[in-house]
Amino acid sequence: MKRFLTMCAGILLICQFTPPLTLAQNAGYEVKGVVVDKSGMPILGATVVEKGTTNGVSTGIDGDYAIRAAGPESVIEVSYVGYKTVSLVASSSLLAHLTLEEDAMGIDDVVVIGYGTVKKNDMTGSVVAIKAEEFNRGAVVSTQDMLKGKVPGVHIIPGDGGPGSSATIRVRGAASLNASNDPLIVIDEVPIAVDGGKGMANPLETINPNDIESFTVLKDASAAAIYGSRASNGVILVTTKKGRGNTPRVSYSGSVSVQTNSDELPVMSPGEFRTYIDQVYPAGTTTGDKVQSMLGDKNTNWQDLVFRTAISHDHNVSLIGNINDRMPYRASVGYTNQQGTLETSKYERGTLDLSLSPNFFDKHLTVNLNAKGVVTSQRYASGGVVGSAAFFNPTIDPYFRNDDGSIDYTTTNGYWNYGSGRGEDFTPNTLLGAGPLSQLYDRDNTARAKRFIGNAQIDYKVHGFEALRFNLNLGLDVSSAKTYDGVNPGSFQAYTDTEARGWGQYSWTTNFRRNQLLEFYANFNKEWGIHHLDVMAGYSWQHFYSSDHSVSYFNETHEQKGEDSRYPFNRQENYLLSFYGRLNYSIASKYLFTFTLRDDASSRFSKDTRWGLFPSGAFAWNIAEENFLKDSRAVSALKLRVGVGQTGQQEIGSNYPYLARYYMSTDVYKTYYMGSAGHMFYLTPGAYDPNIKWETTTTYNVGLDFGFLGGRINGSVDWYLRQTDDLLNSVITPMGSNFGNTVLTNIGSMENKGVEFNLNFIPVQTKDWNLTVGFNGTFQHTEFTKLNNTDDPDYNIQTGSITKGTGNLLQIHKVGYAPYTFYCFQQVYDQDGNPIQNALVDRDKDGKITQADRYVTDKSPNPDFFYGISLKLSYKNWDFGFNGHGSAGNWVFNDFASANSTSNIDINAGNLPNFARLVKKTGFTKANSGEQWYSDMFLENASFFRMDDINLGYTFNKIGNWKGSMRVAFGVQNVFVITDYSGVDPEIPGVNGIDGSIWPRPRTYSLRLNVNF
C-alpha cells in the first residue's frame, strides 16, 4: 500500500504545481457539448480552443467538453487528428452535439493502450492498432485468423485442420526456453489466464469475431512494460464493440460454408500398391509368398473413408443504441456449427455479449459494464487416424463380413481390425493398434465448456477539477470444462484393456478455472499552452484458482475403474499484486516523452525474490510538426521513436516452484511391502530451487513512422533488440545436493533481434474507385547466448521427438544457435544425386557411424523473414479483396518421409502396410539403420506463400423504401499454397517444425450475408 500511496502523492504534487488549464475559465460565455464521429461514437482527446487564444480543453472519455469563451461571438475551433477541423461561433447550436467528418488524407486515430487511450500521433512505443474494417474477411471462426498477416512482428502459426483448433501466436519471436512464450491477452481491460482447461485453452476462441472492434498489439517494452511481469512476449489488447449513436439498430451476419480436404498424405493407390508389391516382393520366394498372401481383393482408399466434405454455418444478431444519450448499449448473440473434414469431428459455439455504459452527474461518472459468455462443445477425432488411414492395407475390406456379405457387427462392431477369432472370441493384435474406422466411430472424446468474462468499470471525473479522474475496475474470468472420453462396448479398444474385458469404458475429466481482478488507478490529464501532461498511477490485484479431477468407469456395470477423489488434490492458486504508473508529456505535439514503472509481486516466487521492478522510457520526435515540414505537401507524417524497457515472465508452468513438493511413487520398486495389505507407495520429493525468480527481458527499439502525399503512402519501420536474462533451464545437480538429478533454475540468456516494416498504399481514391494495398514484413534472428554456468561449447539440450530411431530426439538447444535447431546425420549420395540407404558421413572419421557423427545444422523452424499482404478494391457498391501471408528461411523435418522411406516389411508383424510414394524415389528396400531416420535428406526448406482468402461482395444501400443496407459476399479461404516443401503443408502446428502426419487444413468456400436494419 505504501508503494501505491507514493505514486498517488506524486500525481497530487503534479496537480498542485501544474498551470491552470485555461486563462479564462471562471468568467465569460460558457460553451458545453459533445464531439462524436459520424457513427455517433464519442471522440476522446479532441482539442476545443477559443481561436486566437491559449484558452482550450480536451474532450473527455465520452467526447464531452466545457469551455468559457470571452463572448458569444468568439470563434470556437474543434480539431482532432484524422478529422476535419470545424470552426463555429460560440453561440452556435451545432456545438452542443458536434459531428466531425473524417479527413480522407488523415492517417491517425485514437489507439487503445494499457489503462487508457492515446492519439496515434502521440504514441512513443511500437504499437499497432487494427480496426474492424482492416480484419481478414471470410468465414472466420477463430479470432486469431483476423490478425494473420496483418501485424509486422506477429507470427501466427495455425493449428491443424480440426475445427476449433488453436493457433500459436508469437510476438517478436520467443523470449523463453521453459516458460510460456504466449503473449498476454487483455479483453476489455481484463487480463486473461492462458490455461482455460480443455475446450477453452485458447482465450481468443472465447470471443465471437463479430463482437470485436479492434486489436492493439504492444510489441516493445516501452509500450508493454505497464503490464510488467506478463509482458515479455508482448500484449494483445482486444476491444469489443460498444453502444453508440441514438437510434437503435439491429444487425445480422451469417454464413454457410463448405469445407473440402485440401490435400492427402502421398501414399500409393490400391493399384499402385499391388504393382509395387509384385516388383519388390515377387511370388516364388519365402518372403514374397508370405507378403503376397496378405494381399486382399478389395480396392480401399482409407483416406476417402475417414475424410468428408464438411458443412458449417454461423449466425450472429446484434442490437446497438443509446437510451436518452445516457446509456449506450450493445447486445449480441451468436451461434457457430462447424463440421470437421474428419468424420465425427465437430465444433459448436454459442456466444452472448452485453455492454452497458450509463453515465451520471453530467457525464462525470461513467459505468462500463461488459459481460461475455460462451458455451462450446468440441468432439475431437483422433489425430492419429490420419496416419493410420494412409498406411492401412489398401487391398482389404474396411469391414468384417458375414458369409452373405453383410457386415458382421459382432466383431469389433463391424470395423476391420487386426486380430484373431470372431465375435466374443476375438483377440486383438495390440501391437498394431485400432483400425481407422474404429478410431473414429468407436471412441467419443468430447469436451463441453463454459466461460464467462466480465467486468464493471467505474470512471469518475472530479467535479470542478475535470483533469483528474479515478477508475475502478472489477473483473472476473471463470470457466468450467467437462471432457468425456468413451470407448464403445465390443470395440477393438475395449478388448485391448484387460480390465474392460470387451465392455468398454469411459472417463470424465473436469477442469475449473477462476481469475479475479481488482484494479484502481488515478489519472491526471491536463493541457496548457503547448504543453500536455498525462500521468497515471494504479494498483492491481489478481487471483488465479484452478482445480482438476477425473474418474473412469466400465460401460457394462458403471462401476468405478479407479478411485473417485471427492476432494481433488490438484487444486492450485496463485496471486499477482502490482503497483504501476505512467507519465506522458508532450511539447507542442512535437517532442513526446513516456515513462512507465510497474512493481509486481508473484506468489510463484519466494518472499526473497517475489518482487520485480519493470521500468521503461521512450522519446518520440514528431518531425512533421516542425516548421520546415509543417506545410509540406509531400510529407504528411514523420515521427522518430526511441524506447527501452524491461518486462518480466512469471508464467513458468508451476505455481510452487520454490517449495519442496512430494509426489506419489508409481514405481513398484519404490514401495514398502505391507504383507497381506500389499504395497504402500512412497511419497518421493522433487527437486526445487528456493531462489527461483523472474525471467527478465530488456528491449531496445528504434522506429520511424511516415506518411507521404496526405497519407496516400504511409507506414513504419522498427528495429528491435530483445535480451532475456535469468532464463529458466533444467541443469544437472551435484550428487546429494537436491531431490533429483536436475533442477529448474535461472541460469541462461537469449537474444532476439529484428527489423519490421509496414507499408500501405492508396494508389486510387476517387468517387467510385478505391484501391488500398498493404504489405508488412519482419526479418528476425534468435539465438541462445548462455545455457549453464560454464562456458562448455559442447553443452546442449536435445529435444524434438520423431517417430522412429533410438532416443527419437532430432533438435538441439545450444549457445550460438536458434531454438529447435536441427541436429542430424549427413546423408551420402551417389554420383547421380540419389541417396544411398544407411550411408551417412563419418564426420569424426573413426570408421563407424555413431551419435558423435551428428552435426548441428544452421537450420531451424524459425523463419528468417515472414510477411503479409492485403488488397482491397471497391467500385461503387462492389468490393473485392484478398489476404495472404508467407515466410522464408524456415525449415521442416519431414518425419512422415523419414518414417516411411523404405519398402521393407516386417513379415512377422502380421500386417501389410501401404507405402508412401516416396519409396519409389528413394529406392530404399532394406531396413533402415537407427541412424538413417535422422538423415538431413529429410530436412527441407519450407518457405511458402499462402493465399489466405479471396472475397467478392456487393452492398445494397437501398432496396425500395427500406432504409437499411445489405451485403452479400462469396469467399474462398486457404485458396492455394506456393512452396517447394514436399509434405502436405509447410506450416507445421506448434513451434518445432517436425511434420508427422498432420490433419490437412481444409479449403473453405463460403457465402455470407450482412444485414443492417
Identify the residue ranges that each predicted region occupies.
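Hydrophobic beta-strand positions
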Residues: 35, 50, 58, 400, ...
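Glycine-rich, aromatic-lined ligand/substrate-binding cores of catalytic
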Residues: 861-893
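Short, small/polar-rich motifs associated with maturation and membrane association
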Residues: 1-8, 12-374, 382-383, 388, ...
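Extracytoplasmic gating/loop element in the C-terminal half of outer-membrane beta-barrel translocons
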Residues: 291-293, 437, 602, 834, ...
